Amino acid sequence: MSRHEGVSCDACLKGNFRGRRYKCLICYDYDLCASCYESGATTTRHTTDHPMQCILTRVDFDLYYGGEAFSVEQPQSFTCPYCGKMGYTETSLQEHVTSEHAETSTEVICPICAALPGGDPNHVTDDFAAHLTLEHRAPRDLDESSGVRHVRRMFHPGRGLGGPRARRSNMHFTSSSTGGLSSSQSSYSPSSREAMDPIAELLSQLSGVRRSAGGQLNSSGPSASQLQQLQMQLQLERQHAQAARQQLETARNASRRTNTSSVTTTITQATATANTANTENSPQALHNSQFLLTRLNDPKMSEAERQSMESERADRSLFVQELLLSTLVREESSSSDEDDRGEMADFGAMGCVDIMPLDVALENLNLKESNKGNEPPPPPL
């Protein structure tokens, strides 16, 4: 409550500082603490000639204005963003801008939106007079019967009292209030920089309204019988809704049963069709299988082809026999040419030139070997 929560000085970078806060009405989102403002802090974009709006914390506001009663037109002191004059109320600021700066189109920040809770601290406008006429024209009276009010708890310049807020983010919304805050709709653009507690302010304002209009609320409030009637009506509506829900569920179940029966019928028909098709195709399949077996049993070669194959087999058998015999025959000396010729003649005499079985050839070969073993060895050279 005694600090500007979520606000930092753009000169000394002190955050959540105490005391007065000065808001520049020309530079976007530029704040100074009291010490930096009094020392004349400047930057490349900010100079000492820029109009500044002084904003107080809740504690300082209660200290300065505690116990005083303000009229509706004098809740605070505002600064003109064009000429820098201070001490204006909302009404007098509007009159001053309309008369002195009606043709000025410089972009400035609204001091009322920056100082009052519920406003945008960085609301930039190039038509300040129209903004004042549309947004801040109606007085904020809480009680129509009273001409004065205590604004000590209603409007205070201290923002940042409810929690931290972002310095460069704006959150826009439109609020309309009757009787409590304004008699006409007021459009604000508060940002998260507006961290004061709006709920506490609203509750305090509503408490004043209840005190002033307590009799009217008691006379026009709903009675116990009316509340009972409302409860009965709500119960009837619930019963009707439950009955309608049950009807819908019954209809859904019936439709599901119908769909299930139709699907079952379709599956049965498809099965019968498939069985019929299988029955019709079975004789044809049997005939085809018999036809294939018949083709396998039928001879595929003619007589000439069979003879040529037999002759080819005989030639192959002869070649194999000669190959085996050549490996079994013992090699003789190269000098005995006559013995070689005799062996070849004997080999021809065995009948190997003709086609013979393999066992017959082996038997003839054994006989030849036994005869050669009985002959005397040749004389040495």
From Swiss-Prot:
Zinc finger (ZZ-type): 4-60
Alphabetical list of Pfam families matching this protein: zf-Di19 (PF05605), ZZ (PF00569)
Record-listed Zn(2+) 2 binding positions: 24, 27, 46, 50
Composition bias, Low complexity: 175-192
Keywords: Acetylation, Coiled coil, Cytoplasm, Endosome, Lysosome, Metal-binding, Phosphoprotein, Transferase, Ubl conjugation pathway, Zinc, Zinc-finger
Zinc finger (C2H2-type): 78-101
Family: Belongs to the KCMF1 family.
Protein name: E3 ubiquitin-protein ligase KCMF1
Origin species: Mus musculus
Lineage: Eukaryota, Metazoa, Chordata, Craniata, Vertebrata
